[in-house]
Amino acid sequence: MKIEDNFSFQNNDVIVVGCSSGPDSMALVDMLLKIRDKYQLCLVIAHVNHNVRKESYEEAEYLKEYCDLNNLLFESMVIEEYGDDNFHNEARNIRYNFFENLVKKYNANYLMTAHHGDDLIETILMRMVRGSNLNGYSGFKEVVLMDGYKIVRPLIHYTKQELEDYVKENNVKYYVDSSNDKDKYTRNRYRKYLLPFCHFIQNKIPH
């Protein structure tokens, strides 16, 4: 599994990498580390502490130590309070505002996130149930052109299981967000109950 299979890097690219310390984003960081010297990449690891779990401070500290050990730039923020809006939407808006500020600070070419194939399926299913138009059925794009930079999701061709296998095979330490198991969040319910069924059906289709 090589990130170069899905994206063409250029020498001296500056990349802001959204990283939660979970298996998906740690896989992304590890893949980028493996090619950093080849392309002389400048990697800025961006972490947002959502401040909803007591373990989140331990995770942030681990990620800082990991970045120090690997000579990676590390930037972090803590969300001190939320409004009354949808939690996931509000957290996402805060994250991307933070990422965009870092892109400007470092004059980055790219913002990379660890969204994978399962995330894409979840998004499509949620939009279908909510009555999205045909454009919504395509989910999110692998590359999005922004003002002066691009958002890139280079892991979109892999499943979550493949990324979990990757971090275990490469001995990459990661943390698991326990809040992902809570049924009160809509996306979690899709992830726990609908996605396994989709994979089951997919495995039954002759290839």
Where are each of the predicted segments found?
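Core alpha/beta nucleotide-donor-binding catalytic domains of modification enzymes
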Residues: 1-193
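ATP/NTP-dependent adenylation/nucleotidyl-transfer catalytic domains that generate, transfer
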Residues: 185-207
